[in-house]
Amino acid sequence: MWMAWCVAALSVVAVCGTSHETNTVLRVTKDVLSNAISGMLQQSDALHSALREVPLGVGDIPYNDFHVRGPPPVYTNGKKLDGIYQYGHIETNDNTAQLGGKYRYGEILESEGSIRDLRNSGYRSAENAYGGHRGLGRYRAAPVGRLHRRELQPGEIPPGVATGAVGPGGLLGTGGMLAADGILAGQGGLLGGGGLLGDGGLLGGGGVLGVLGEGGILSTVQGITGLRIVELTLPRVSVRLLPGVGVYLSLYTRVAINGKSLIGFLDIAVEVNITAKVRLTMDRTGYPRLVIERCDTLLGGIKVKLLRGLLPNLVDNLVNRVLADVLPDLLCPIVDVVLGLVNDQLGLVDSLIPLGILGSVQYTFSSLPLVTGEFLELDLNTLVGEAGGGLIDYPLGWPAVSPKPMPELPPMGDNTKSQLAMSANFLGSVLTLLQKQHALDLDITNGMFEELPPLTTATLGALIPKVFQQYPESCPLIIRIQVLNPPSVMLQKDKALVKVLATAEVMVSQPKDLETTICLIDVDTEFLASFSTEGDKLMIDAKLEKTSLNLRTSNVGNFDIGLMEVLVEKIFDLAFMPAMNAVLGSGVPLPKILNIDFSNADIDVLEDLLVLSA
């Protein structure tokens, strides 16, 4: 148990301590992002979560202001439009009344803020209206002599006016046309109780304007209740890349909403364009993250169906205003959910992907992704690990040269939406894993491969007479091939070479399982590699190009190694190469990200670079 814990701890240290060197680059266009987001919306329950009742209080705080920038500044003399915060404030003086507000007929708003009621009994006589109430009223006649003139003080009424129009019998006095008992203000008059504009009249309190006033349908959002989103169509997604920032996301959808109003049930259909500015960042763990900076909803094509009654146009306006307030709080969270799914997809890149039964491949981000006007570029460091062991470092042993830096990628084609570039270093790491696991080592015996000539001392003796002299009776041979150093991968324009330096030990199998070595040969081979894709894997197929032999040791004396070139080449072509291709047959896993499909990708071999375009 202690040993297992130590191995696990060392593996973690190895992963954390590995330098972030780019050996794989992925480029995607905005279309890939759009398709990925559309697919996630279709598969997830993000839309279903929005089908709910609008909670009370939603709409008082715009999503894109209070959730991002904080509350707006407070204006001391600014009044709220119909009691709901809007972007624009109404700048008013302190002594102005509000349309449909608190003030009723017969009331005066004093300069200090109090309300004076002119309808009580104390104002029904001329005496109270002018002289008798002089001590309480704010207006008074200016005392002045016959031959003297002076300036009027604030609040004074000229004497002629005070005793004329405002006096008893005057226009505004008791009994006058405009007095409390007159045609306009008297009981039953135009402005009186029960009159056209009076309290209880058609346009007064309780009438049409009462509906519009304090507590009326237009004073608060509560004029519409029971709002519930009942249907949300699958959004049409569009993405615009913002160089150096991230993306500008747009979700166009149709929303069906039910609700109630004072004049009937509402069926609301509205077209909504949810727009969000999204910044691409990288968190502390090294994963890229898409984060909303701002979210807005643009409404259009609002249709309201209701039992037609009073003021349908005013109800339409109210619906427009209410939806503009409440929909951001309900629909912008959908963007949060979708981006969370995209971030989860980006995190899947870091998961271990099996490389057959021998090891695994892990793609990690080596730097902050690059956003241009044409594509999003993800720099990846691909780690190849042994099954239950450590990571494969490239190069390891031979060839003892430093890995080349990641070459510059070619421009993306007009019809290319995804581009994956893999360096020769990464492909070499995959072959190194096979070498370390001894997957390339092979023992070949007589009769194992029908295509080969008989592997006996008689066959070898025909080439090397000293073998026939030493083994006059035919004995079976064993050809033991070992790859002691990691293979190397060389990528050139339209050509990929895999170099394998192996040893071939020729042994005689004798009775009682005795094995005697005849010679040890260094075999320097070159294979032409071809690439294809199958599902989410890169397939590699090798074909023998040439072999070069060098005699290292011999127990039958020196001989011309060139005599064995034909036989050894056949052994590597008909036995070693199929065995190596069988091991490579499991394929190299490609990064699983954003639902990119490379199954029909075009593959180009460039200098030190393998490029897949889909």
From Swiss-Prot:
Glycans are attached at N273. It holds the Pfam family LBP_BPI_CETP_C. One of its GO terms (cellular component) is cytosol. It comes from the Eukaryota. It is found in: Secreted; Cytoplasm. Keywords: Cytoplasm, Disulfide bond, Glycoprotein, Secreted, Signal. Expressed in nasal tissue. InterPro entries: Bactericidal_perm-incr_a/b_dom, BPI_fold-BPI/LBP, Lipid-bd_serum_glycop_C, Lipid-bd_serum_glycop_N. The keyword Cytoplasm applies. Residues 1-18 form the signal peptide. Its main location: secreted. GO terms for molecular function: lipid binding. Belongs to the BPI/LBP/Plunc superfamily. BPI/LBP family. May have the capacity to recognize and bind specific classes of odorants. May act as a carrier molecule, transporting odorants across the mucus layer to access receptor sites. May serve as a primary defense mechanism by recognizing and removing potentially harmful odorants or pathogenic microorganisms from the mucosa or clearing excess odorant from mucus to enable new odorant stimuli to be received. This is BPI fold-containing family B member 4. It comes from Homo sapiens. The lineage of its organism: Eukaryota, Metazoa, Chordata, Craniata, Vertebrata. The gene is BPIFB4.
